[in-house]
Amino acid sequence: MMTTRRLVCSGFTALTALTALAALAVPASAQGLEKFPFRLNWTLYGEHAPFFVARDKGFYKEEGLDVEIAEGSGSTTVAQLVANQTSPVAYVDAATMMRGIGAGMPIRAVGVTLQQSPMSFIYRADAARPTKIEEIKGSRIAMTAGDASLAIFTAFMGKLGMSVDDVKLITVANPQSKEQAVLNKQADALLGYFMDQGPRMQLQTGVRMGWTRLTDLSGISTLSSAIIVNNAWVKEGKNADLLRRFLRASQRGWQYTFDNRDEAAEIFMKNAPAFNKEISLLEIDGTMTILRTKASEGKPLAWSAEQDWKDTQVLLETFAKLKPQADLSTYYTNEYLAEPPYLPKK
């Protein structure tokens, strides 16, 4: 709850306050900041907190950037926006990006934040299904149109000797409808992230929720969320430098979130009014468990290993009809990332 206090200022104090307010009113361009639009993969959830931490703690500003964070409507749609330069830098599911590249999209990952798949079946605890392999066939699974989870789910089903046709897919228009389908028992489960929908739905509705990670059922995992860019955009003018500054401040935001989760939750709440402290902290804590793989351990945040890209490609090629790339660097580069402690260059 916000309270307003009346301050009675006089003389120099009042003048100082007015000067500070005037400074806040100065547009970013007048402060020497460069606009940098950044589109998320989805509506806000705890995984996005580090980007707001980087913005609200002034990390982007210290890099000379005025970062505008916009919500997305699914990785498939957002990848297309990056490909046509409507949003030249964005945050999407890595597998979805790989499929886009196979279809000719001129896009590439420049940082991978989530390096293990959080994909899960999320269901009501009083109607838990599927919790084991034998329960998957015939289950009603809710999914949004353009959902990033489809590629991973297809590979998951193939690994288990099944296909997507073995479940009843219920396609809905938006994330809220997907959740309502499960809450109203029109679907048995939705495909989502274990650190997002399950805890939030339970805390917001009072309905006890459960979830089963796909990797626990099949043993498979893939690279997950990535910052991607348009290939032509990054070669234009000073865009490569802008990108380096953005990534350095973002890495700093992720590190700060890892080290200061309580404060990060407070910052995220201010930007996502639908979230309370408990939900924000739960989602942030879950996110922080899947930042690295064995191959990327000890490397800078968002640095990804060639072996992990290879493993992800083999899985998607084998079970989800991904068109493979002979050169794995078509998918990614680490060249724009910074080394710890991710501070601005003097």
Predicted feature residues:
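Secondary-structure end/capping motifs
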Residues: 237-319
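Sec/Tat signal peptide C-region and signal peptidase I cleavage site
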Residues: 21-30
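Short, glycine-/small- and polar/acidic-enriched structural segments
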Residues: 30-184, 188-195, 211-215, 221
